[in-house]
Amino acid sequence: MKTIIDNFVDRVIEYGMYNEIDKIYVKNRVLALIGEEGIDRISDENDLKQIKDYLVEIALKNGKIKDLIEEKECLGAELMNFIVPLPSRLNDIFWSSYDISPQEAVEEFYKLSKDSDYIKTSAIAKNIEFRASTKYGELEITINLSKPEKDPKTIAAEKLVKATNYPKCLLCMENEGYQGRINYPARSNHRIIRLKLGDEVWGFQYSPYSYFNEHAIFLNSQHVPMAITSKTFEQLLEIVDILPGYFAGSNSDLPISGGSILSHNHYQGGKHIFPMEKAKFESEFCFKDFEDVNAGIVKWPMSVIRLQSENKNRLLDLATKILNKWREYSDLEVDIIAMTEDVPHHTVTPIARKVDGRYELDIVLRDNHTTEQYPDGVFHPHQDVQHIKKENIGLIEVMGLAILPPRLKPELEEVGKYLLGEDNAIADYHLEWADQLKEKYPRINKEEVNSVVQHEAGQVFARVLEDAGVYKNTPSGHEAFMRFVKSVGIN
């Protein structure tokens, strides 16, 4: 049996960053972080992340850190950093491995990101995930419980922290190895693979709070704002060439229709087949001068033009033509407005894939204009569905995966109690919906109530996506969609 610190040191050496001769050195470096009291505790624990948690507890007892989530996270990341190579070494390892097997290189990087606790697998496991059958196929729902909520002590401590603009944002290269602070996440164990996209240097990393398998982030090495251009399509198609089996997509570059970070140009990707990818063509056509590109409208709640070709350059040229036309296209009959004075409203959410040597590009048309009736956005979740989802509909939601707020875990449980006629604390904003469900399921029982509520939450998410779709799934909506397609030019 070994002491907990010796156990930790042995596990660190197993990862190959240090040799047997480094044992004393590593132990002393760990002691500098956690203190020297309580280190004789015997442990046969083999899980490195669990041992790390024990060492953080020792550091807390020794007064090396305060009892704040952020300080524990910072120390935890510092301890796990012992198993992660320096950025230069890791990039050498990755690209050397890539030359032999791209798939193996990616798998090794993903494994390291999990093993080092950069990807918060334990926290992610807390999420509630389910699927819901809709007329658009099965949609995926996640109630996001993974990110720790701030406690009162942390909120109080934040007020005492001086403002700083370093790192500039959560997506900057400056985060690599950053210790973290009270109001900023720990990144000591964070590493970024450098890659060239065209003439630009970009970074490839994983999301610490993944929403799907191998949830990757690709970030510009420079702190430049989101911008959907021809270069966006080019870079997304390049990513799917570099990383076999990955999709790559971008949030749009305008508020309301975009993601939460517009200040730093980035894409997302991963190894996951989203519901939208499974959706079939509703109608197919041929764009003029692009007879070699298969094209059509996808049967989906949002407005999607899908392009398919083995020729990447042809796909790029057609996508650019569609984007340029959409930027200036208005159709007042269906409330589609490209510009208000000098303010642009039109952009796209693009998603690239490569399947069996064939490139596929989904172009989701977006419009962010507002009216008095819809101050949050004409093509944003409307008031009657905001009890489930009121946040922006970004890339992940567009593809059919709802990321719902933590409040919905207890709130949906209360909706279930309401349907059963039990004592409950149902939120006022769920009442109208719950009454509709009561009417729809008059004889609901305890065994089925949870699955019924989840299924119906999925139907609301489908409506959320319909609200965000610029062309509605009606005969007049389809007719209007085809007016735009014809304006681009079809045979």
Curated annotation (Swiss-Prot):
EC number: 2.7.7.12
GO molecular function: UDP-glucose:hexose-1-phosphate uridylyltransferase activity
Pathway participation: Carbohydrate metabolism; galactose metabolism
Enzyme class: transferase
Top-rank taxon, per record: Bacteria
A Pfam family assignment: GalP_UDP_transf
Compartments, record wording: Cytoplasm
UniProtKB keywords: Carbohydrate metabolism, Cytoplasm, Galactose metabolism, Nucleotidyltransferase, Transferase
Cysteines engaged in disulfide bonds, as pairs: none
Predominant place of localization: cytoplasm
Catalytically driven reaction(s): alpha-D-galactose 1-phosphate + UDP-alpha-D-glucose = alpha-D-glucose 1-phosphate + UDP-alpha-D-galactose
Family, per entry: Belongs to the galactose-1-phosphate uridylyltransferase type 2 family.
Protein name from the UniProt record: Galactose-1-phosphate uridylyltransferase 1
Gene this chain is encoded by: galT1
